């Protein structure tokens, strides 16, 4: 019980820090000092949301301090596979809402409700319904459900990085010999990043220098490289 109380208290503190306390409707612009004070810690929530043609959508949401999020949705009682889907993107806070923008540019909205998050409608307004639209604070691992990612892959000195097209964030890539060979073949003689489309998921691994948990891209497929293209290319 004590451990649960501590987890709940930390969730409340982190959530209030995340949402801020000003009254502006747009995303906050903070001074460096304010940004340091309001820097959020990774946070996660879980719950079962309503579903029109299944028993419910088991939803897990993970916010990261780098401004990104990952969501996993599992359709309970679904007859078709796959029944689990993952998505990711960037988050921002307004005066009273949490705004999630996914990798396709679509937005969704939530608001603080105690130590929980309440899902809002597509316009960012409360949903008038008898059904539950609340995600409770929880401690969970990042989902392993594959999702499509596109970004610039670069490999040098036994280390690979991936700069995601949707978020602009750069991640280390888990060791993958096949992907490394494909990159070397695609880049030719030039030592430069190559556009990559790959199915993968995020995981936490210890930083080789500090040992601190670091978010890493773990490829689930061989992926496909597009030489001489970048994130602005129509052919990505």
From Swiss-Prot:
| Lipid attachment points (N-palmitoyl cysteine) | 21
Gene inactivation phenotype reads: No visible phenotype. Slightly copper sensitive. Decreased numbers of stationary phase cells bind to hydrophobic surfaces, cellular adhesion has altered dynamic properties; no induction of cpxR when cells bind to hydrophobic surfaces.
GO MF entry, a single one = identical protein binding
> Lipid (S-diacylglycerol cysteine) linked to which residue positions?
21
Q: Which GO terms describe its biological process?
A: cell adhesion; cellular response to cell envelope stress; regulation of cell-substrate adhesion; stress response to copper ion
Outcome of altering residue 231 to S? No oxidized monomer forms
Tagged with keyword Signal: yes
Which cysteines are disulphide-bonded? 165-231
Q: How does it sit in the membrane?
A: Lipid-anchor
The record's PROSITE patterns line, in alphabetical order, gives: PROKAR_LIPOPROTEIN
User: In this UniProt entry, which residues form the Periplasmic topological domain(s)?
Assistant: 21-236
Annotated Gene Ontology cellular components are: cell outer membrane
* PTM comment text: Palmitoylated.
The UniProt annotation puts the region (Could contain a copper-binding motif) at: 144-156
Q: Where is this region: C-terminal domain?
A: 126-236
Annotated stretches, region: N-terminal domain: 21-100
First and last residue of the signal peptide = 1-20
The record's section on NCBIfam families has:
PRK10523.1
How does this polypeptide assemble, per the annotation? Answer: Probably exists as a monomer in vivo, can however form homodimers which swap domains.
Query: What domain comment accompanies this record?
Result: The mature protein has 2 domains, the N-terminus (residues 21-100) and the C-terminus (residues 126-236) joined by a flexible linker; both domains form beta-barrels.
What protein name is recorded for this chain?
Lipoprotein NlpE
* Source organism of the structure: Escherichia coli (strain K12)
Q: Which gene encodes it?
A: nlpE
């Amino acid at each position: 019980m004590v451990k649960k109380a501590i987890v709940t208290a930390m969730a409340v503190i982190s959530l209030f820090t995340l949402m801020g306390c000003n009254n502006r409707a747009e995303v906050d612009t903070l001074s460096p000092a304010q940004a340091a004070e309001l820097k959020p810690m990774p946070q996660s929530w879980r719950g079962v949301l309503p579903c029109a043609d299944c028993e419910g959508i088991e939803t897990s949401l993970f916010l990261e301090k780098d401004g990104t999020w990952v969501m996993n949705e599992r359709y309970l009682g679904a007859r078709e596979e796959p029944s689990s889907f993952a998505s990711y993107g960037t988050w921002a806070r307004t005066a009273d809402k949490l705004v999630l923008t996914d990798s396709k540019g679509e937005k969704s909205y939530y608001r603080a409700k105690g130590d929980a998050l309440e899902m809002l409608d597509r316009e960012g307004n409360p949903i008038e319904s008898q059904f539950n639209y609340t995600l409770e604070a929880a401690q969970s691992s990042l989902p392993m459900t594959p999702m499509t990612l596109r970004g610039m892959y670069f490999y040098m000195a036994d280390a690979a990085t991936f700069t995601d097209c949707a978020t602009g964030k750069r991640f280390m890539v888990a060791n993958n010999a096949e992907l490394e060979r494909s990159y070397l073949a695609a880049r030719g003689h030039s030592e430069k990043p190559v556009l990559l489309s790959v199915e993968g998921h995020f995981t936490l691994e210890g930083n080789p220098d500090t040992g601190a948990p670091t978010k890493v891209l773990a490829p689930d497929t061989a992926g496909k490289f597009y030489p001489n293209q970048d994130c602005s290319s129509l052919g990505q």
